[in-house]
Swiss-Prot record:
The keyword Lyase applies. The gene is pdaD. The record marks S51, S52 as: Cleavage (non-hydrolytic). It comes from Methanococcus maripaludis (strain C5 / ATCC BAA-1333). It catalyses: L-arginine + H(+) = agmatine + CO2. One of its GO terms (biological process) is arginine catabolic process. This is Pyruvoyl-dependent arginine decarboxylase. The modification Pyruvic acid (Ser) is found at S52. Belongs to the PdaD family.
């Protein structure tokens, strides 16, 4: 009789999460995006875009010092506009379950509009995600950025996952 064992991932699940946000304005969309990353503190990292799941028991902490060039799992939202005077926003929320054995949810949202609208929306998205799962929320943490375009502008918000 063959023994079966659990399948193990070759990747270790991150155990910290940091919420960051920033804005940028430049003469082209990519540099506006890059400036927003720099202002959020993650501009010199290689972001690996992930879906919106926070590993169980991960701690929410201020952004740690991560070596430049590191591959960093990140959920993020951003809004770019080339319309001078237009206001753009991006937000991210993390819903933490009461049952600490469950994963948390990361929700990202971006819009043409203001920071309050964006942050309210992204928090409601987290609530709905928990309702769909039938889980109870312990806490929702969120952050958002807002930018009024001068040339080409970008609002950015992210949840960067890392390791203790």
């Amino acid at each position: 009789m063959m023994k079966t064992s659990a399948i193990h991932s070759p990747f270790e699940a991150p155990n910290t999460i940091s919420l960051v946000a920033g804005t940028g304005d430049s003469n082209n969309p990519l540099n506006a995006f890059d400036m927003s990353l720099l202002k959020s503190g993650i501009g010199n990292l290689n972001l690996i875009r992930i879906s919106s799941i926070m590993p169980p028991k991960a701690d929410i902490i201020p952004l740690p010092k991560i070596p430049q060039g590191s591959l960093v799992p990140t959920a993020y939202g951003y809004q770019i506009s080339e319309i001078k005077g237009e206001t753009v926003a991006a937000g991210i929320s993390v819903a933490i379950p009461k049952d600490k054995e469950l994963c948390g949810l990361i929700m990202e949202y971006e819009c043409v509009g203001g920071k309050k609208e964006c942050e309210d929306t992204v928090r409601n998205m987290a609530k709905e995600g928990f309702e769909m799962r039938g889980w109870e929320i312990d806490e929702i943490i969120s952050i958002a950025s807002e930018h009024t375009v001068e040339n080409i502008g970008c609002a950015f918000a992210a949840a960067a996952l890392w390791y203790k």
